[in-house]
Swiss-Prot record:
Optimum pH is 6.5. The lineage of its organism: Bacteria, Bacillati, Bacillota, Bacilli, Bacillales. This is 4,4'-diapophytoene desaturase (4,4'-diaponeurosporene-forming). Reacts with dehydrosqualene and not with squalene as substrate, however it can utilize zeta-carotene and phytoene to a certain extent. It comes from Staphylococcus aureus (strain Newman). Is inhibited by diphenylamine. GO terms for molecular function: 4,4'-diapophytoene desaturase (4,4'-diaponeurosporene-forming). The keyword Flavoprotein applies.
Length: 502
């Protein structure tokens, strides 16, 4: 069969490879001039920067894409586990190194507060149990009809998840120490959600880091995008770049998707899998006479969106890779207040920031004697933060100064401004324009209870035959391992349909 995949982000690349490995003719259409989507790369002034995700969690999910296609993952990506997850800075002279080794982890916890290990381990155990339930009964399945969700098994297993509790409530139930609470709560920002609003299940990220480890891909995270692109090439997939999709064509008589309009041409296909940002697709790519019924264009703005980010890619003329960790977090003095600012639409003058120094793990990513630094500051998305003008150069200059002051929390960066030889910024406006991310959201639709599982945009269209959706704004959600799972379960359903002649 001829299959079209819209979008060459990590979801689209993974999905296309899985389909092609089953013997089908696959074409990927990508609007930009390179693959990867938000897993993007910037090469500038001799530096190589990952532009989007940077932390490799759940490596087995990465490997599975290749092995499911009958290939050896080691021929495409080089993975290695990190001994330390990150350094966390509460202040200039208050730093904690978070290890993966259990004995070292216990030492770290006891150094923060004697006796805290028991509560921390109880938290991890609770979350692990919830994760296993969620993975088996909710995350790794699709919901094609109401009875797939509304049944006794889902009711019983869902009750065990206690989804009415929020992430911060679960953390505070087990952890009294404020520093340790911060260590656990900030990671909900990895998928753009407010720990006060996100279901307690979304506190799984620290558990995944501790129990499955954190890894690094040689060449940076973009090495995964390159590996997937090579996998597709080896499987005979055709990738068309600079291919802007103008419309998904729906046959009104048979109510099926049978073509796409790309760069002015109508291209016929047997099935279409769309991995572009779902809200933008529902708003702009469906014909007027054939909207996605639950998500018509006029309702898209009313959905809840994850936060955005202000990113800086900085090159400095000194090598500091032996004085800093690969992954670092610098906390705001008022962490809770900063969370409120992000999700209430205000800019922070004392943000929590994430700092990634890739040359710590791979010297090839910076010129000899120099260092590349990636900084992420969570910000409101464009709807909540409608009063923020990201095109205002005075404003972006002010934000850069805030970030440089915050970076000075790390001793080696105290004089960073005098060493800068390269600087690039990426704003919420850029998320919207580059990736068609609605409201510049960095992680798609926010996974609130009302936008999760059965209530999230589904992988198999309920309105039109031969149309499928995958990616961060669809089930099961955002984050690289999760969108890879989205690709898998969507392709599984497509293959079942093909085998049944549907």
């Amino acid at each position: 069969m001829k299959i079209a995949v819209i979008g060459a982000g990590v979801t689209g690349l993974a999905a296309a490879a899985r389909i092609a490995s089953q013997g089908h003719e696959v074409t990927i259409f990508e609007k930009n001039n390179n693959v990867g989507g938000r897993m993007n790369q910037l090469k500038k002034d001799g530096f190589t920067f990952d532009m989007g995700p940077t932390i490799v969690m759940m490596p087995d999910v990465y490997k599975d894409v290749f092995t499911a296609c009958g290939k050896n993952y080691e021929d495409y990506i080089e993975l290695r586990q990190l001994r330390y997850i990150y350094d966390v800075y509460f202040d200039h002279d208050d730093r904690i190194t978070v290890p993966t080794d259990l004995a070292e982890l216990q030492q770290m916890l006891e150094s923060i507060e004697p006796g805290s290990t028991h509560g921390f381990m109880s938290f991890l155990t609770d979350v692990y149990k919830k994760y296993e339930i969620a993975r088996r009964y909710f995350l790794e399945r699709t919901y094609r009809k109401p009875s797939d969700f509304y049944n006794m098994t889902s009711l019983v297993q869902g009750a065990k998840l206690k989804t009415l509790n929020h992430a911060d409530q679960l953390i505070e139930h087990y952890i009294d120490n404020e520093k340790i609470q911060k260590l656990l709560a900030f990671q909900t920002l990895y998928i753009g959600i407010d720990p006060k609003r996100g279901p307690s299940l979304y506190s799984i990220i620290p558990m995944i880091e501790m129990m499955f480890g954190v890894h690094f891909i040689k060449g940076g995270m973009y090495g995964m995008a390159q590996g997937l692109a090579q996998l597709n090439k080896d499987l005979g997939v055709n990738i068309e770049l600079n291919a802007e999709i103008e419309q998904i064509i729906i046959d009104p008589k048979f109510k099926r998707a049978d073509a796409i309009k790309v760069n002015g041409d109508i291209r016929k296909f047997d099935k279409i899998l769309c991995t572009a940002d779902f809200p933008s697709v529902a708003e702009s790519l469906m014909p007027d006479f054939a909207p996605i019924k639950k998500y018509p264009p006029h309702k898209i703005a009313d959905l809840d969106y994850s936060c955005s980010a202000f990113l800086m890619y900085i090159g400095i003329d000194i090598d500091v890779t032996d004085q800093v960790r690969l992954h670092n977090v610098i906390f705001s003095d008022d962490f809770r207040g900063n969370i409120e600012e992000i999700f209430e639409g205000r800019l922070s003058y004392d943000p929590s920031i994430y700092v990634y120094v890739p040359a710590v793990a791979d010297k090839s990513l910076a010129p000899e004697g120099k260092t590349g630094i990636y900084v992420l500051m969570p910000t409101p998305e464009l709807k909540t933060g409608s009063g923020i003008d990201w095109s205002d150069e005075a404003l972006t200059q002010q934000i850069k100064e805030i970030i440089y002051r915050k970076l000075a929390t790390i001793e080696v960066f105290e004089d960073i401004k005098s060493h800068i030889v390269s600087e690039t910024i990426f704003t919420p406006n850029d998320f919207e324009q580059t990736y068609h991310a609605k409201f510049g959201s960095a992680f798609g639709l926010m996974p609130t209870l009302a936008q999760s599982n059965y209530y999230r945009p589904q992988n198999v269209s309920r309105d039109y035959k031969d149309l499928y959706f995958a990616g961060a704004s669809t089930h099961p959600g955002a984050g690289v391992p999760i969108v890879l799972t989205s690709a898998k379960i969507t392709v599984d359903e497509m293959i079942k349909d093909i085998e049944r002649g549907v």
